[in-house]
Regions:
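N-terminal Lys/Arg-rich, disordered targeting/topogenic segments
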Residues: 1-12
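Hydrophobic membrane-insertion alpha-helices, especially the h-region
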Residues: 16-31
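Solvent-exposed, non-transmembrane regions of membrane-associated and secreted proteins
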Residues: 28-271
Length: 271
């Protein structure tokens, strides 16, 4: 065999080896991307955002046009399907004004308006948002404000009314009841900010573990957002009833509405 033939074969061998090496590197890179860099199905799902439908946007625009015309401090609307809790929500710079000030601006003790804590973001984006309202039943025979929140201290009522809906000018938020606790008026649980995820989970964990009325097998997670409906107990003005609710994540809203849509629809009960 000539030197030329040997050289030619050697060149072909080198070319083939180079092609194989490139293929191996490319294939390895693909597997690394799939294993470590490419977003998983769960991650993509968790990052999904909720977009209000045109129908929902029109409904909210019409509703809040009237609400904001009556009270420019309106930030939302809260109702609990199957109950008579059906109230606009306001926010101002303090937590005292709306204890007596009605939604239309008239002062009426024991009525007032449901209001968001002054330290919360009005778009319900905080990890823990507080709404406050009177329970009027012992003083006035009606279901206005947060009277119906007190009924959640009975497990059967809690189980029968698991969802709360918050409407804002931009969209709806859906919540599921997690726990109902009765606490002193000056409880340390009244917080709107936390040091870190661990601090948040610790407080929510204590609340869930000590609650006598709750949804079973709930795992508190710092990834979730919570809403609290807080009101006084009719039998004792020094204690409070706090209903804790978990916000349905945007990644779950579409399926949640498909499953529960009819029972979540707004049905007015205000006189």
């Amino acid at each position: 065999m000539s030197r030329r033939s040997t050289t030619k074969k050697s060149s072909i061998t080198k070319i083939i080896a180079s092609i194989v090496a490139v293929a191996v590197v490319a294939l390895g890179g693909f597997f690394i991307y799939k294993s470590f860099l490419a977003p998983s199905g769960d991650k993509i799902k968790s990052e999904q955002t909720y977009t209000a439908s045109d129908e929902e946007k029109e409904y909210l625009a019409n509703k809040f046009k009237g609400l904001l015309a009556t009270n420019s401090e309106t930030v939302g609307y809260v109702y609990i399907p199957g109950t008579q809790l059906d109230e606009p929500v306001v926010q101002t710079t303090d937590n005292a004004t709306y204890l007596d000030k009605r939604f239309d601006g008239v002062n009426e003790p024991l009525m007032g308006t449901v209001f968001m804590d002054a330290d919360n973001k009005k778009d319900f984006s905080d990890r823990l948002t507080w709404l406050f309202g009177h329970a009027r039943g012992s003083k006035v025979v009606d279901h206005r404000m947060f009277k119906d929140v007190n009924y959640f201290s009975r497990q059967e009522y809690f189980d029968a009314h698991p969802y709360v809906v918050i409407e804002t000018p931009e969209r709806k938020y859906y919540y599921e009841a997690v726990a109902m606790i009765i606490v002193p008026e000056e409880t340390a649980f009244y917080r709107t900010s936390f040091d870190d995820d661990k601090d948040f989970e610790k407080q929510l964990g204590i609340i869930y573990d000590t609650a006598e009325v709750k949804k079973p097998n709930v795992k508190v997670s710092a990834k979730d957002k919570y809403l609290v409906l807080s009101t006084c107990r009719e039998e004792d003005d020094t204690i409070r009833a706090n209903l804790y609710l978990r916000q349905i994540p945007d990644s779950e809203v579409s399926d949640f509405v498909k499953q529960h849509g009819e029972e979540l629809k707004y049905k007015p009960t205000r006189e």
